[in-house]
């Protein structure tokens, strides 16, 4: 039935850590921590496919990722206290070959050199690990702590100064930069000790990086701090050290102080302050030296990337290039602020420099330049930074909406046409709109039409949104979606500074409403920028110009919304909220015509309802609940009232997480999925009693958390997708009381955590079916299934 399954897209955001990413200098592959996985991305791939794989293994948020220079190895660390060693199995995929379980607290810093890594732990210990050439495994060579009160490392940087002789720069919860030296011998680490404390910073040190100068024995060390300054330190060895006599009466200042020490009898080292770089308005997050030129890239919490280099005439370090945004204090992401940059990367490809940085929203921004003067912003990648809670295809199946606990609703669609209207050879998926940037965690979403959706956050109300003209034009241009009645669409949307509601940006907007929400009366021209796009929107456009205006709020629930569904005729909304009693565990029905509740509410359950599903013909409404019961409500098609028709008080032994209806041609059949690890099929029978009876059941090894049935039958069988709490996904065909396993998706392409939602697209493209997957591992994934 199914010939092959291909991951079409993986949308996942980067963790908010300063050492969360690195790039392989030869392969040009970016690895970054994304939740408890490591995402792999080729930023120069010509088709802009985005993340192509996620590496599983860690059990908590990944904090550090480093490629070992001049090798096929990568090192990662996590809040699970583990360090993992990875090795490339081919040009673009890695496999874990070693897990270091030595630590009892979070790993917060990593640095790597060929066959050598240093690890900083939140308990204050700093470890040096050496690789065994015979089996590629790393063994502990030395471990020490900085004896300076309460101190734990935040950043590390290793540098080889001579054969088998090394320096380790350490920054952390102290204003000083600590320098340790050691000798690598056949027997292990010798003479490892802290030899200098570089003074000057006024706050914690967050980033360190060594650079080898053209002259052998001459090095630069840069240090970035929360005091907003970057300091450069000159390191010289032996004959390069300034040994001129110093006047003992002369006042020693930080600017002329020399730190001198010996690594052994043959190697002397001198360190002095070289330069102070000022210009950033917030904490220094990440520093990167250029591969060949004397230039320094800095990413900071003021949402800027700046390239610094010495002036040819004066030698003073000046900013030669600034990228990012002009941020303002107190600005939120909803009003256009990125929330600062966390890590940055810098690499050269085909005589072009590429700058990468990740921000608060989990997205990656990319710029490219040939002359370091004019920069061209390139298409980056994006994704949620917290659990994806729900997904929903548009009725046409041409785009996918996803909600997340990161308080966003995102729209994903395939990039099919270029700006000139030509069809692209390979269609790739991208985030085309961010309809909702909210102040509450987002819980559920459902589309009403191709131009309207309803969502529920961690609040008591439902909100409805309409597609604006600018986004409609962009989707028509790049995706090929045709929308009717564009003239009636709102022009755009904005978020008031003190509000939660996306306001329509039209000239005739209600001024009283704007004043009530604390918004600005001026309507910015935010439609035109979208018409100028040559590719899918980038992060700054997603944050500012691609919101959808909110058209209605639906009230009635007493607690936070948990689930909702839209009737097939698009006339009704069914919703439920959190509850621990019968009074609040009711289903409320709203009309999409007048946005009013159709009373009475529907009581039956006693705990939180987990899923609501209308039958394909809209005549029945199915509810499943934490109380382990399911109920079936029959709809009066004339007045849209409901009556409890069928119920089962003991269908499962644990919570029922999900349910779905089979296609109408298969009969009156629905399927339930439960924490008791079972999937059960229920069919309507009129004899011996008019009821829904259990027709078949299948049990898995883990709790079943999501289920979805395709709208169409294939070879007179229904196609069922099943998701488990550990991220596994199964595909079954079902008929006549018999499950037949089609395939279990390969572990390499499935999520690393609970499947929160599975949804089949109604659309078939080029003989392929499309399955959307939302997961607690932060990812939204889209798979294509080629079938016979």
Curated annotation (Swiss-Prot):
Task: Give the region (Disordered) as residue ranges.
Answer: 490-530
The family database entries (Pfam families) matched by this protein are listed as: WD40
Task: Name the predominant localization.
Answer: cytoplasm
WD repeat feature ranges: 13-51, 57-96, 102-139, 200-243, 279-318, 336-377, 383-422, 437-475, 556-600, 604-643, 651-692, 699-742, 750-788
For molecular function, the Gene Ontology terms on record are: microtubule binding
Chain positions with Phosphoserine modification: 492
Q: Does the keyword Iron apply?
A: no
In UniProt terms, what is the effect of altering residue 626 to A? Dramatically reduced interaction with microtubules but no effect on interaction with ELP1/IKI3 or ELP3
**What pathway does the UniProt record associate with this protein?**
tRNA modification; 5-methoxycarbonylmethyl-2-thiouridine-tRNA biosynthesis
InterPro entries in the cross-refs? Elp2, WD40/YVTN_repeat-like_dom_sf, WD40_repeat_dom_sf, WD40_rpt
GO biological process, any: protein urmylation
Sorted alphabetically, the keyword list is: Cytoplasm, Nucleus, Phosphoprotein, Protein transport, Repeat, Transport, tRNA processing, WD repeat
Q: Where in the cell is it found?
A: Cytoplasm; Nucleus
- Domain of life from the UniProt record: Eukaryota
Q: Which stretches are tagged as biased composition: Acidic residues?
A: 507-517
What does the UniProt record report as the effect of altering residue 628 to A in this chain?
Answer: Dramatically reduced interaction with microtubules but no effect on interaction with ELP1/IKI3 or ELP3
What domain comment accompanies this record? Folds into a two seven-bladed beta-propeller structure which is required for elongator complex assembly and association with microtubules.
Q: What protein family does this chain belong to?
A: Belongs to the WD repeat ELP2 family.
Give the misc comment: Present with 6090 molecules/cell in log phase SD medium.
Give the protein's function.
Answer: Component of the elongator complex, a multiprotein complex which is required for multiple tRNA modifications, including mcm5U (5-methoxycarbonylmethyl uridine), mcm5s2U (5-methoxycarbonylmethyl-2-thiouridine), and ncm5U (5-carbamoylmethyl uridine). The elongator complex catalyzes formation of carboxymethyluridine in the wobble base at position 34 in tRNAs. It functions as a gamma-toxin target (TOT); disruption of the complex confers resistance to Kluyveromyces lactis toxin zymocin (pGKL1 killer toxin). May also be involved in sensitivity to Pichia inositovora toxin.
Name of the protein in question: Elongator complex protein 2
């Amino acid at each position: 039935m199914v010939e092959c399954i291909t991951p079409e897209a993986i949308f996942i955001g980067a963790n908010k850590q300063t050492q969360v990413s690195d790039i392989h200098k030869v392969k040009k592959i970016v690895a970054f921590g994304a939740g408890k996985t490591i995402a792999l991305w080729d930023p120069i791939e010509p088709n802009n496919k985005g993340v192509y794989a996620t590496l599983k293994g860690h059990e908590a948020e990944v904090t550090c990722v480093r490629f070992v220079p001049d090798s096929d190895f990568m090192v990662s660390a996590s809040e699970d206290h583990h360090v993992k060693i990875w090795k490339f199995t081919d040009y673009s995929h890695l496999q874990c070959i070693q897990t270091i379980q030595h630590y009892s607290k979070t790993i917060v810093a990593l640095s790597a050199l060929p066959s050598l890594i240093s690890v900083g732990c939140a308990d204050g210990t700093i470890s040096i690990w050496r690789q065994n050439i015979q089996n590629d495994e790393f063994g502990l060579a030395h471990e020490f702590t900085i004896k300076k009160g309460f101190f734990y490392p935040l950043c590390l940087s290793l540098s080889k100064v001579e054969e088998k002789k090394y320096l380790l720069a350490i920054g952390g919860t102290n204003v000083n930069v600590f320098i340790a030296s050691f000798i690598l011998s056949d027997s292990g680490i010798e003479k490892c000790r802290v030899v200098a404390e570089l003074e000057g910073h006024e706050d914690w040190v967050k980033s360190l990086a060594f650079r080898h100068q053209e002259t052998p024995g001459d090095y630069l060390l840069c240090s970035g701090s929360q005091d907003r300054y970057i300091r450069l330190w000159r390191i010289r060895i032996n004959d390069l050290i300034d040994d001129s006599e110093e006047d003992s009466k002369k006042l020693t200042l930080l600017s002329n102080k020399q730190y001198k020490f010996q690594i052994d009898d043959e190697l002397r080292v001198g360190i002095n302050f070289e330069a102070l770089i000022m210009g950033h308005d917030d904490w220094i997050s990440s520093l990167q030296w250029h591969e060949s030129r004397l230039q320094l890239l800095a990413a900071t919490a003021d949402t800027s990337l700046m390239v610094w280099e010495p002036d040819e005439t004066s030698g003073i370090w000046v900013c030669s290039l600034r990228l990012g945004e002009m941020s303002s204090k107190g600005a939120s992401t909803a009003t256009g602020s990125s929330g600062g940059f966390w890590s940055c990367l810098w690499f050269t490809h085909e005589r072009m420099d590429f700058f990468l940085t990740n921000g608060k929203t989990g997205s990656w921004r990319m710029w490219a330049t040939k002359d370091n003067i004019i920069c061209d912003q390139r298409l980056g990648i994006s994704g949620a930074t917290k659990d994806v809670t729900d997904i929903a295809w548009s009725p046409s199946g041409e785009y996918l909406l996803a909600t997340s606990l990161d308080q966003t609703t995102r729209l994903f669609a395939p990039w099919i046409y270029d700006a000139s209207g030509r069809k692209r050879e390979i269609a790739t998926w991208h985030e085309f709109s961010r309809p909702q940037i909210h102040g509450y965690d987002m819980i559920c979403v459902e589309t009403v039409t191709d131009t309207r959706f309803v969502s529920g956050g961690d609040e008591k109300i439902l909100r409805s949104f309409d597609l604006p003209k600018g986004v409609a034009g962009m989707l028509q241009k790049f995706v090929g979606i045709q929308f009717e009645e564009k003239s009636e669409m709102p022009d755009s949307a904005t978020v008031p500074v003190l509000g939660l509601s996306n306001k329509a940006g039209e000239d005739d907007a209600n001024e009283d409403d704007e004043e009530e929400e604390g918004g600005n009366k001026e309507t910015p021209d935010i439609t035109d920028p979208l018409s100028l796009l040559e590719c899918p929107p980038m992060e700054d456009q997603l944050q500012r110009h691609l919101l959808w205006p909110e058209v209605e709020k639906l009230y009635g629930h007493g607690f936070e919304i948990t689930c909702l569904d839209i009737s097939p005729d698009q006339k009704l909304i069914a919703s439920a909220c959190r509850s621990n009693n019968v009074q609040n565990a009711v289903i409320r029905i709203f009309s999409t015509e007048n946005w009013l509740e159709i009373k009475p509410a529907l009581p039956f359950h006693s705990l939180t309802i987990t899923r609501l599903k209308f039958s394909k013909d809209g005549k029945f409404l199915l509810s499943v609940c934490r109380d382990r019961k399911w109920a079936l409500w029959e709809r009066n098609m004339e007045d849209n009232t409901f009556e409890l028709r069928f119920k089962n008080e003991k269908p499962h032994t644990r919570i029922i997480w999900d349910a779905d209806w089979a296609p109408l041609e298969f009969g009156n059949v629905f399927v339930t999925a439960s924490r008791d690890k079972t999937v059960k099929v229920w069919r309507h029978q009129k004899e011996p009693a008019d009821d829904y009876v259990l027709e078949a059941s299948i049990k898995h090894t883990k709790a079943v958390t999501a289920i979805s049935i395709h709208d169409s039958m294939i070879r007179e069988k229904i196609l069922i997708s099943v998701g488990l709490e550990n991220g596994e996904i199964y595909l079954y065909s079902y008929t006549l009381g018999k499950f037949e396993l089609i395939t279990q998706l390969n572990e390499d392409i499935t999520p690393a955590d609970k499947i929160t939602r599975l949804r089949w697209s109604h659309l078939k493209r080029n003989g392929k079916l499309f399955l959307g997957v939302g997961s607690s591992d932060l990812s939204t994934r889209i798979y294509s299934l080629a079938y016979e």
